[in-house]
């Protein structure tokens, strides 16, 4: 089990670097509208779960984005390996963060309640 402060620092570095790589290095149009919301590392720092959000609510766009991220994960991991100061670069696992859509849904419900009253 890694030191929690070290894991947190490394997660922040991974988030910053992945965001930078998606903006500047990855030319796949499927991943242009991706926002990295957070990164969680496993206890042994071997797996980085990268949570992302997209602006579109369409299921087809979500699938395309997931496929684009998985296709780019090898290049992203290689670039992370040269940027991070760790013995082994963590494996990357991309997961869509649906909290933004959930928050928008809750806001819509509250707005409807206010307009009804």
Swiss-Prot record:
Q: Which GO terms describe its molecular function?
A: ribosomal small subunit binding
Instruction: Output the superkingdom of the source species.
Output: Bacteria
The primary location reported for this protein is: cytoplasm
Q: Which UniProt keywords apply?
A: Cytoplasm, Ribosome biogenesis
Biological processes per GO annotation: maturation of SSU-rRNA
Q: Signal peptide position in this chain?
A: none
Name the InterPro entries on file.
Answer: KH_dom-like_a/b, RbfA, RbfA_dom_sf, Ribosome-bd_factorA_CS
The similarity comment for this entry is:
Belongs to the RbfA family.
Share what the entry says about its subunit structure, partners included. Answer: Monomer. Binds 30S ribosomal subunits, but not 50S ribosomal subunits or 70S ribosomes.
Role this protein plays: One of several proteins that assist in the late maturation steps of the functional core of the 30S ribosomal subunit. Associates with free 30S ribosomal subunits (but not with 30S subunits that are part of 70S ribosomes or polysomes). Required for efficient processing of 16S rRNA. May interact with the 5'-terminal helix region of 16S rRNA.
Q: What is this protein's name?
A: Ribosome-binding factor A
Originating organism = Leuconostoc mesenteroides subsp. mesenteroides (strain ATCC 8293 / DSM 20343 / BCRC 11652 / CCM 1803 / JCM 6124 / NCDO 523 / NBRC 100496 / NCIMB 8023 / NCTC 12954 / NRRL B-1118 / 37Y)
Gene behind the chain: rbfA
């Amino acid at each position: 089990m890694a030191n929690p402060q070290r894991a947190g620092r490394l997660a922040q570095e991974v988030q910053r670097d992945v965001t930078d790589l998606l903006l500047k290095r990855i030319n796949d149009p499927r991943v242009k509208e991706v926002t990295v919301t957070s990164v969680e590392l496993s206890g042994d720092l071997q797996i980085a779960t990268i949570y992302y959000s997209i602006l579109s609510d369409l299921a087809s766009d979500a699938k395309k984005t997931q496929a684009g991220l998985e296709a780019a994960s090898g290049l992203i991991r290689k670039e992370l390996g040269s940027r991070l100061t760790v013995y082994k670069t963590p494996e990357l696992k991309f997961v869509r963060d649906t909290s933004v859509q959930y928050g928008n849904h809750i806001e819509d419900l509250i707005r409807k309640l206010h307009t009804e009253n």
